[in-house]
Amino acid sequence: MKVAIIGATGYGGIELIRLLQQHPYFSIVSIHSFSQVGEHITSSYPHLRRFLVYTLQEIDVESIKKEADLVFLATPAGVSVKLTPLLLKAGLKVIDLSGDFRMVNPSIYEMWYKKPAASEEFLQQAVYGLSEWKRDEIQQAKLVANPGCFATATLLAIAPLMRNKIIEENSIIIDAKSGVSGAGKTPTHAAHFPELYDNLHIYKVNEHQHIPEIEQMLIGWNEQAKPITFSTHLIPVSRGIMVTLYAKIRKYVQIEELHNLYTNIYKNAYFVRIRPYGEFPSIKEVRGSNYCDIGIGYDERTKRITVVAVIDNMMKGAAGQAVQNANLVARLDEKTGLQYIPIYP
């Protein structure tokens, strides 16, 4: 399948290039940028020398449709709202890494993103691309809304509990921490080295834009779902997300039952690895890979469950899951081109 990448010079776009250039069935036919048209990609990213000969092109749908079958949009929020309808009308399939098509309700998008929403016509076409839980829908989709990085880790961690109504819906607390690449390529004060190094920032407390897409999925799994408490932190590493979920158990359950629940639910999910009871993952153990590692603990004294999930925010949290979804759209094995061993140490 021939693919194009729009927004190729951001961190998500560069990770897509790395994965797709090594993919056995996808071929990159063009890469596109808003600000660096005419430049060679290696002028910004010298590590790609010898691997790529692409020059960044302007975004012209007519030209793209002559070469590509599928387009990856690695653009900021508010951009794909305008581009996606044009691409779909041109007969192209789209994997959108932004948040523009994740929400079913346009007013909720506008409330959280402070931008005009896409039309309901196209929002209804979009399939939320949480690969492990939406495989069948993704295979039929023309437009896949790739989930946010925090949302991916959170939803994979909480899905077995919510779907089986094991926890009290009003007791969910999520403590999420991300490496600085999650803040994007554009420099910010919080991501400035003297501010970030040897420090820890909390930001967007209960205001992060991934909250509504998490709650949207929770309601779909359990109609009794309530708003969640969700905090995000910036940590001084380049890649990685750790989500720690706390919730009160509805009735007494043995930890072995909880562990078996996760193991059975994810037994056919290649990229979800459940740790043995009492063992919890670290972000370095998934770095550079498409894996989500999950550890489960239960405090009988407080009747609370603790679930820890880690992902690489650039892989399972962005480009890796986008390629996984593209594999599904192309009716390939979803593991194709993604079986990278994590980089360690």
UniProtKB/Swiss-Prot annotation:
UniProt cross-references to NCBIfam families, sorted A to Z: argC
Signal sequence, renumbered to the chain: none
HAMAP family documented for this protein: ArgC_type1
Entry's localization field: Cytoplasm
Protein name in the entry: N-acetyl-gamma-glutamyl-phosphate reductase
Pathway assignment: Amino-acid biosynthesis; L-arginine biosynthesis; N(2)-acetyl-L-ornithine from L-glutamate: step 3/4
Gene3D superfamilies: Dihydrodipicolinate Reductase, domain 2, NAD(P)-binding Rossmann-like Domain
EC number: 1.2.1.38
Species the sequence originates in: Bacillus cytotoxicus (strain DSM 22905 / CIP 110041 / 391-98 / NVH 391-98)
Active site: 149
GO biological-process terms attached to the record: L-arginine biosynthetic process
Reaction(s) the record says it catalyses: N-acetyl-L-glutamate 5-semialdehyde + phosphate + NADP(+) = N-acetyl-L-glutamyl 5-phosphate + NADPH + H(+)
InterPro entries in the record: AGPR_AS, AGPR_type-1, NAD(P)-bd_dom_sf, NAGSA_dehydrogenase, Semialdehyde_DH_NAD-bd
Highest taxon listed in the record's lineage: Bacteria
Recorded GO CC terms: cytoplasm
